[in-house]
Amino acid sequence: MDFSIEEYDLTFDFDLSEFTYRGKEKIKLSGEANELVLDSVRLSIDSVKLNGSAVDFDVNDKALRIESRIKSGDVVDIDFHAKVSDTLMGLYLSKTREGTMITTQFESTGARMAFPCIDHPAYKAVFSITLVIDKDYDAISNMPVKKVETSDRKIVEFEKTPRMSTYLLYIGVGKFKYASERYKDREIILASLKDIKSKYPIDIAKRSIEFYEGYFGIPYALPKMHLISVPEFGAGAMENWGAITFREIALMATEDSGSLMKQNAAITIAHEIAHQWFGDLVTMKWWNDLWLNESFATFMSYKTVDSFSKQWDVFSDFIKSETGGALRSDSLKNTHPIEVDVKDPDEISQIFDEISYGKGASILRMIEDYVGAEDFRKGISKYLKEHAYGNAEGSDLWNAIETESGKPVNRIMEAWITKAGYPVLKVNKDGNRIRLTQEQFYLDGTSGNTEWPIPLTIITKKGKVSMLMEDEVYIDEMLKLNANNSGFYRVMYDNDTFNTVISSLDKFSNLDKWGLLNDMYAFLVSGRLSVNEYVERIKNFLNDEDHLVVEEIASQLTSLYLIKPSSQVVYQLAKDYLRNQVQRLGTKKKGEDDKISKLRGIVYQDLVTVDEDFAKELSPQFASLSEDPDLALAKAVAKARTDGLNELIDAANKYTDDEIRVRVIAAMGWCSKDQLSTIFSLIDNGTIKKQDMLYVFSFVVTNPSGRDFFFQNIDKIVSLMEHAFEGTGYTSRILEGSIPYIGLEKYEEIKAKASQIRSPSYNVGIDKGLETLEIIRKLYNKL
């Protein structure tokens, strides 16, 4: 960098009746340049001064250009004004029946929508923030309040921040209610427009901070931490340094909430707090290393929650959600490497995906298993201490872990982050020995020639054996490869070796069994196993009562049903299995294991999806929606399947608690085709929040009766999603998920429509959706 910005001194003066603001900005510069170009989007620039004198400037739709030579010590003053955004990006308006809130979402390129800046993660600066607001409102930013002046209006000045990136700045204005507790000498504050029912989120935050301080050997850097509940929030949660924002559902969890909600809230809170070190204290130099932030926070969030809630068995969810989602996405030819060369801001939102989060986190788990937990921890701590308050690249982290472990981490990680996809290990009996080879796995049934150095783990009669596989390998014996599914690869056994594996099934962990099941399903979808072979193999697992095994089988059979509801083989297998599980699990018992409560909700929901008769049986229980929150979604979908839209609307208006309300909204997607058009009016009148459109449209497309509705209204759906979720990548994801289902019935039509609606911000989703369509069409014809 030839120059840098040392400090932004920003004052925002809000007109809360018109939802506009005026900004005064003082930028202190260091270094030299022939001109100053600041990112600036949808801002009206009133004046620019350099060292107190007016200067010429030029504005276009992307930047403010100040055509004067600059040098160290120069100060630029900018006056500007803008509207508070009505999207969910930048500095925007968030409304709820409890009130109105101004909030911010700046990752990845939203800061430029709020004030002129160099909106680049490597350009760290100190921020001095002052907010001018109405007297009956409160203000929150990254740092504690320095002073408040009140006359006609309230002027709130905050302490200066440490050096940090623009995307981590936070500004919040609202009539907040608070709860707080101290952790050591720091205050942890929960802020919400709604009444606060529990300090459960604060307790999770305190436990998370305690874990990270011990794990990293570095204290939390700021004097306070806000956990801020945002009524309308596209991103889900955001790690603004010292002022973390969440969707309301994450901070509404109480000790009495359903098992799923409590666990999801804990993992979400722990994820964002991990970023306070990994992302905020040390930040990637550019968005090509976004995965480093997100994958690490993802992996650490599960590790953290597991440290204080062993009963949840959260690494079962890690394997199912993070590793499983990444394996599925990364087996498409329209995948991308973990490390992506990002040039255009429109591309950034599309890499917030299963690869950046799930694959990256799974690779970190694989490396931790390879080098050992303690050397991995030491490497992380070394990396954070060396780059605190600065920027770093992936290679900096690998060097630190390699130094601590003495193992070739750099060489291994170079291959895994720069090559798209992953291997399948082929296991074949070769005389008295077993031969292991690798090839790249694709879900379309083809194979690639790319190879990886694989940290291989083998379960043998004598225990676990580890090695680095870089060529074909011969081994003398094995019970199973990929112990605890620690490696990011699949394993294809020939019949002889598969029989060996099955004969030892009772010796394996639930993570091992999940890996076998998940691989079997991938081999079915890709044509490597026939339907009959798949059915015969899955029979080995049907009597297993482990929660993860049951969840995986239920998910697979329900997915096959949704691909071809008319297949009697699939319908009968799915219905019989799910009915047996519902009967086995029975009703909720006092003091039962949270894993059982969560599992019951999953199998009930899957059976409601598959079996209309069960939906009719369960529908009357909709009246007791809040009695067992884990069953709320199943009961709501049952009501939707039995023409209960009006009752769903009443419930959506009745429940202010997002734990129930969001499930009711999502279930509306399973209403009959003639009722689905009501969804648009519910979005218009605010019954369905903008942030919750994603849920309802996702359910519409899994509903066999809703696919034609989605297709007929795809232009409107895309328009609504793009406006609300600008810069988040959610439109790309909804198209990726919907195109395959729609195309099973409207193959040529969806291909033509996809070509008409293409846009740089969601082309990736279209391409993945079309590729997945071709894959499941082949499967459809075999079912």
UniProtKB/Swiss-Prot annotation:
The keyword Metal-binding applies. Its EC number is 3.4.11.-. The record marks Y357 as: Transition state stabilizer. It is an enzyme of class 3 (hydrolase). It comes from the Archaea. Pfam families: ERAP1_C, Peptidase_M1, Peptidase_M1_N. The active site is at E272 (proton acceptor). Its main location: cytoplasm. Its cofactor is Zn(2+). Binds 1 zinc ion per subunit. One of its GO terms (biological process) is peptide catabolic process. It is found in: Cytoplasm. GO terms for molecular function: metalloaminopeptidase activity; peptide binding; zinc ion binding. Zn(2+) binds at H271, H275, E294. One of its GO terms (cellular component) is cytoplasm. Keywords: Aminopeptidase, Cytoplasm, Hydrolase, Metal-binding, Metalloprotease, Protease, Zinc. Substrate binds at E107, G236, A237, M238, E239, N240. PANTHER family: PROTEASE M1 ZINC METALLOPROTEASE, PUROMYCIN-SENSITIVE AMINOPEPTIDASE-RELATED. Proteases F1, F2 and F3 degrade oligopeptides produced by Tricorn (themselves probably produced by the proteasome), yielding free amino acids. Belongs to the peptidase M1 family. Monomer. Part of the Tricorn proteolytic complex. This is Tricorn protease-interacting factor F2.
